[in-house]
Amino acid sequence: MANIFNNEKIVIRGAREHNLKNIDLDIPRNKLVVISGLSGSGKSSLAFDTLFAEGQRRYMESLSSYARQFLGSMDKPDVDLIEGLSPAISIEQKSTNKNPRSTVGTITEIYDYYRLLYARAGHAHCPKCGREIKEQPVDQIIDSIMSWPEGTKIQVLAPVIRGKKGEHAKIIEDAQKSGFIRARIDGVMTSLDDSIKLDKQKKHTIEIVVDRIVLGPDVRKRLADSVETALQSANGIIVVTKRVEDKEVEVFFSQKNACPDCGISVPELQPRLFSFNNPFGACPECTGLGQKMEWDVKKIIPDSSKSFNEGALAFYNPESEWNHSMFQAVAEEGGFSLDTPVENLSKEQSDFLWNGGGENRKIHWIYKKQSGEGYSEYNRAWPGIISDMKRRYADAWGDAQRVRIEEKFMSVSHCSSCHGQRLRPEALGVTVGGKNIWELCCLSVSESIDFFSGLELSESESKIAAQVLKEIRARLKFLKDVGLDYLTLERAAETLSGGEAQRIRLATQIGSALTGVMYILDEPSIGLHQRDNQRLIDTLTYLRDQGNTVIVVEHDEQTLRTADFLVDIGPGAGIHGGRVVAAGTPEEVMKVAESKTGQYLAGTLRMEIPSERRKGNGQKIVLSGVTEHNLKNVSIEIPLGTFTCITGVSGSGKSTLMSDVLYPVLSNKIMRTSYPVGAYKEISGIENIDKVINIDQSPIGRTPRSNPATYVGVFDAIRDLFAATPEAKANGYQKGRFSFNVKGGRCENCQGSGTITIEMNFLPDVFITCDVCGGKRFNKETLDVTYKGKNINDVLNMTIEEACGFFVSIPHISRKLETLRSVGLGYIQLGQSALTLSGGEAQRVKLANELARVSTGKTLYIMDEPTTGLHFADVKQLMAVIQRLVEQGNTVLMIEHNLDVICQADYLIDLGPEGGFRGGNIIAKGTPEEVSSVKESYTGQFIKEMLDR
């Protein structure tokens, strides 16, 4: 076999990981290789679980035994042989950073360079008055003064008092004793021999005249003595006045970073001063998070038309004897009644209720004990509701009670000290190019590129910052190249979509400039508009041209056509996949009749465009005056009874419009939720729908216990079946025996999770397979019970498709399983951990759960890119489900980039024209045909190509 090995290809023989069927494959090295196929066909098993896993394992084995003991061992993939592997780097789309301290700037390391730039070339300003502060040694001060024109008349002043109340007699007396004869007091030149009496109730400024000099080549020694004397007298600060064209001009010099007016010192400019993750630079109030849990008045008083006795103060139960007695005393002292609606209280009364009246206004009340045995009498100052709630919060029993108080009565809001800017005032007072570091981070990537292109620095600053600026510009360009020019660097990492997070990591890899590496990417085009797709492809080909092998799992048509080598796995999903259906250039794959990908590229398979568009039921929801984030007073109409898509380039405002404004306002009004709502003017037409459901990509659970079976509600019915078997009845096993959430039938070593959680403190928790049950979750006695020859673990390990056949005779189970299969999830396991599901898979599980419910025909379904991770054939299947929902009278509103889906819509709302501050406008609306005729719409241009095919 030795002759099959060479440096030009990666050789795979006998790959059997997961559903792969003994695959043999040769992949060319240093090429752009795209792996395609239906969802669940085995693409990720080949790319990540075989190629990447083996690359990682070999790298680990190359380390010393000492290093390996900290990393643990990695299992060898189920494969006979892999040769020609390079060091592997995986860039997946589902590992979004949830750390609230992580931002786009920190994870791309651009913020580190910003910190360095501000520390080396920043201009400090007083955080109070805004005056620029410069630190200058004595020699530099003297050189600056001597550089003024010869013959200039100057005065050297020592500002011994700056804006302080008092008579300052001692200061004046000391100046006289030191031999000084003049001082400028409150701007007026005064002889120290005069009788000087200052008003002690007013603020004064006293500047001692140390010397008067006419500049010339022979005065340097005298000037130096005078400057040093003035600096010593005024604690490192001097004022020098000079005559310029009959005007007196003042120049301030400081030996330290201190404001001459306010006396506020600024610490030495170091990179750590600009880090919100370092106590030296972080805002002391919010510790650098930029936000805090604050008491929410709307939650404390949800209905201000009510009185205390009617329950206006949600934090206090009016039926509590203690609360009633105390507030009766508060009302008497405040001059109102407990039957007075809160909104009718005067400003004075309201202020007393909220903030108290100080130590002088005490309240007196008697608390009768519930037992009836005696009473307690109190006479104390009323601190106000806020202080009282803070005390009760601090005294809460344990974290659970504190969390309950936070959820019910508090909201996350911008820190009132730093206003969400995370840093201490001294750091925010430092500018480069007129902007402080936070203002710079608030610019989009494209705006930042423009800022640094026009940045003007002094000659010395340019030399110091040259290398830093080079790195910053390069990294910003990489972000732009992967289609993320609309992002701001202050954007929290936890708010990024999976696709955005992946493209950020891709940009970071470009910046590392590695060669000879095998990059493996998972659908980098997710969330990307067709307009930006070419830039992403250019990035992938750039990585390839640097001498790397780039392997991409992808469904995007343009990427598939660009591939040097295309591998199509299939032909179906799950047990029906796992084979190499076709491999070669895209043109070669198109000739393979069995390849659905090839037939799609060839145009043989396609989604038929509807011959007519639904007009809807004549009703509509109108949302107007939306100004949240970058939206520019946008107003939209959503025709009910239609399938409507919101389109636009990345960052144009789609998610803001749908997820931050429309969904929360509808949910709050219809479903009685209390989500924060973005800025808008008004909404109408809500009465035309009775339910709004947001089917998003958040996980269906956050622990290994959560799985599709429990989420859609079939696991209860399956446990009933097992409990009804003769074996279970003979042993007295009830339904609970087959639950991994309660004691009895579960494995107690892992408590039914199948894994043991190892807490890593500062790192994410690690899950390892339980060594007692081997990951089966249940104990041996429970696993001995079988239904149709399968135990409960066997059933949980079935794919949805296998389970559909297994439970075909049980309608209430098979109906729910069929909905999972209908949304393209036939390949996932019934008991598959929620932690292993991608965002797109989790979204489709939720969609299946909704499909299984009885439709009212007046529901608005909201979805954000449900085609994520879907092959063309899966998209076709999903669209049939979506159209079925609309046929039942419901409305579907969807954010989408997939052109096949967009062309299926009845109505489009296109936002743009660009992302970030250049977006936020409605560019086009109407049917796909109408939008395709709008030249300003990027979406319309691509739709036109699709419609013209």
What does each of the following model-derived ranges do?
Residues 1-949:
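Conserved phosphate-binding elements of NTP-dependent enzyme cores
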